[in-house]
Structures are given as structure tokens and as C-alpha cells.
Swiss-Prot record:
One of its GO terms (molecular function) is single-stranded DNA binding. The lineage of its organism: Bacteria, Pseudomonadati, Pseudomonadota, Alphaproteobacteria, Hyphomicrobiales. Homotetramer. It comes from Brucella melitensis biotype 1 (strain ATCC 23456 / CCUG 17765 / NCTC 10094 / 16M). Plays an important role in DNA replication, recombination and repair. Binds to ssDNA and to an array of partner proteins to recruit them to their sites of action during DNA metabolism. This is Single-stranded DNA-binding protein. InterPro entries: NA-bd_OB-fold, Primosome_PriB/ssb, ssDNA-bd.
């Protein structure tokens, strides 16, 4: 295969307020912990089961980090688009440690606020490249998910008559 794809899309809730810090270069970085959950009914017992996965997200895009700092709070529902990266470091005992994170680089990645708890911020989309570095209102046609032109009717995207209830 000539190419490969490293793309992660998450829709989940923040487990804590964003952690904001500055690198030695002065660049702003935001760290998020996002929970995604699923539930199902056990076929043998009929018991309802739940599982939550926690994801570490690192935002190196200054504009997206500012949005996270200003508008995101614990419990906020967000859409994140980034890439997987694994870091390696040594702990205090000299043991190799690894951490896999979803990373939004300076010119790649997307952050979209999905709930209205942030006073009118429903569906605000913030992207990390080209003209997508600006706010755009959620139009019900999928928002700004990297499309280069206007939405073409009902092909793709989200439908306005979908139930707001997430199945997990």
C-alpha cells in the first residue's frame, strides 16, 4: 500500500477542565481527558453493562488551545479530530514508559463544541488548517468536517431529525 492514514475522531465528554500550559518556546498547549462510553445488555443475564474509555488529548494548535481554555469545562460534550501519537519517556527509576495520545497539531485537527451549556456555543467548530481556522456555525449538514465547498443537499453529514439522545 502506497499510503497510510492516522486519523482519530472522538465524540465524548470532558472528565475535567482543560489543563493549559506553555512550552519553553511560549506556545500554548491544552491537555484534555475525554470519556467515551458504551452500554449493552448481557445476553445471558439480561443485565445492563457499561464501559467507559478515557482518552488523553493534546492540543498544540494555539487557537484551539485558546478555545479550550475559554469555553470548555468539565462535562462538556466535544467532537475531536486528530492523530494518534505514542510518546516514550523514562520514569524516576529509569524504566521506559509509554503514553498514547490523540494529538491536534498546529495546522491539523478539529475541535467542535457539541452542547449548549456554553451559552450559545452549540455546534461551534474550530479547525486547524487553511480557512478552517475560523468559527463556523453548525448547519445540520455535517458542520465543517473538512469539506471544501457548501453542503450539497442531503448527501452525507447529519440529519436534523436525528434524536439528540446518544445511545450510550
Amino acid at each position: 500500500m502506497a499510503g497510510s492514514v492516522n486519523k482519530v475522531i472522538l465524540v465524548g465528554n470532558l472528565g475535567a477542565d482543560p489543563e493549559i500550559r506553555r512550552l519553553n518556546s511560549g506556545d500554548m498547549v491544552a491537555n484534555l481527558r475525554i470519556a467515551t462510553s458504551e452500554s449493552w445488555r448481557d445476553r445471558q443475564t439480561g443485565e445492563r453493562k457499561d464501559r467507559t474509555e478515557w482518552h488523553s488529548v493534546v492540543i498544540f494548535n494555539e487557537n484551539l488551545a485558546k478555545v479550550a481554555e475559554q469555553y470548555l469545562k468539565k462535562g462538556a460534550k466535544v467532537y475531536i479530530e486528530g492523530a494518534l501519537q505514542t510518546r516514550k519517556w523514562q520514569d524516576q527509576n529509569g524504566n521506559d514508559r509509554y503514553s498514547t495520545e490523540i494529538v491536534l497539531q498546529k495546522f491539523r485537527g478539529e475541535l467542535q463544541m457539541l452542547d449548549s451549556r456554553s451559552e450559545g456555543s452549540e455546534g461551534r467548530s474550530f479547525g486547524g488548517g487553511g480557512n478552517r481556522n475560523q468559527m463556523s456555525d453548525y448547519s445540520g449538514g455535517g458542520g465543517d468536517f473538512g469539506s471544501s465547498g457548501p453542503s450539497s443537499g442531503s448527501s452525507g453529514g447529519f440529519s436534523r431529525d436525528l434524536d439528540d439522545e446518544i445511545p450510550f
